[in-house]
Amino acid sequence: MKKFVVERNLPGAGNLTTEELQTISQTSCEAIDELNKPYHWIQSFITSDKIYCVHIAESEEVVREHARLGKMPVHTVAEVKAIIDPLTSNPLE
């Protein structure tokens, strides 16, 4: 399985209410159930006009199928090739 970052253009996303975010979350979970394939939604980050989601799936096509089933916009899907953090700056001893 691969990790993907999904960029969704959604004007006004930063102004979504708690209830609206809950509905979006429920819709995503329902779409995952409908996929009937291995799939994990890790988390999403809401900005002013976009939502960035982290998903684990077999392929980009499966990620796009999840979006189609949930009627969610998809601007880009990018496969994560590496993850770094502050600890990356220190060589292993």
Each model region followed by its residue ranges:
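Short, well-ordered beta-strand segments in beta-rich or mixed alpha/beta enzyme
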Residues: V6-R8, W41-H66
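Alpha-helix C-cap/termination motif
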Residues: E34-L35, L69
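A short linear hydrophobic-aromatic micro-motif
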Residues: K37-Q43, T76
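An amphipathic, aromatic/His-enriched active-site/gating alpha helix that lines ligand/cofactor pockets
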Residues: I56-I83
